[in-house]
């Protein structure tokens, strides 16, 4: 045959012997593994040496045989993790974008909550009722600086009520209707507010001129103000209560004293309106209606001393026509006795 005549014909015997040897070796290895894995009880000592030998030889052989499978598993895990990581990356990016929105919202709510806490922390001495409101409109111009707040007459707000944010005085109410009120800012050209320097109690009028820093007019006293002095409301005239924070004094480029408003340090979005009318509401009504003095009892005008005075008794003066002779004076008693007459006179 051509196969036998060819160069491969000489490989028949080696291939047969190789197959036979491989079969025998496999059988021996199989028997050795069976013996090594056998759970011996009574014959444990008989196969102890064989088991130890098989374990010693099987360890590197098992490692070499298991290496390709292990490498294949690692490769599959890598490919699987690559595609899983790509999918997970896309999912995490979408989640991160969503969480950024929640983060921005949480920061906004935290800022709003802090401002609400600051507004709730506003206290006046003596206490004055307040109404919280949100500024819904901003009207700015070269001459007018006003805001609209979403609280009106239904909440007891009237014209002239002071308006504050969490930092200080903002302005006062100049117009009110149901559900809305107009607030005139301190920077408006029509704004006039009596203030005083907290350090010296020097009085002045805070006058708006349309700029960010209103000026101090009619400042009285000797050296009444210094750079950085705290300016508060004076309460003069009963327009606003005394002691509300306004700002800090600074000297402008024109040489005039001005005020850096505390209210400008925070946005004017949420405000509190003081329901302040006049100083009469600051006093205790019970003290104003204190017990008065007991009433004075008076007599009847007909019998009063003032209307019918009683005359003192006066001795009557006799008239010449009705005059009567006065009685003779009584005889004085004799001091010596007279002898009795016994005979005729001589």
UniProtKB/Swiss-Prot annotation:
Disruption phenotype: Affects the localization of MltA, MipA and PBP2. In the case of MltA and MipA no polar localization is observed, and in that of PBP2 the banded localization pattern is lost. Depletion of both MreC and RodA results in defects in stalk growth and mutant cells expand relative to wild-type cells. They appear to arrest in expansion along the long axis of the cell. Its main location: periplasm. Keywords: Cell shape, Coiled coil, Periplasm. It comes from the Bacteria. One of its GO terms (cellular component) is plasma membrane. Residues 89-118 form a coiled coil. Interacts with penicillin-binding proteins (PBP2, PBP1a, PBP1b, PBP2a and PBP2b). Interacts with outer membrane proteins belonging to the TonB-dependent receptor family of transport proteins. Belongs to the MreC family. This is Cell shape-determining protein MreC. It comes from Caulobacter vibrioides (strain NA1000 / CB15N) (Caulobacter crescentus). The lineage of its organism: Bacteria, Pseudomonadati, Pseudomonadota, Alphaproteobacteria, Caulobacterales.
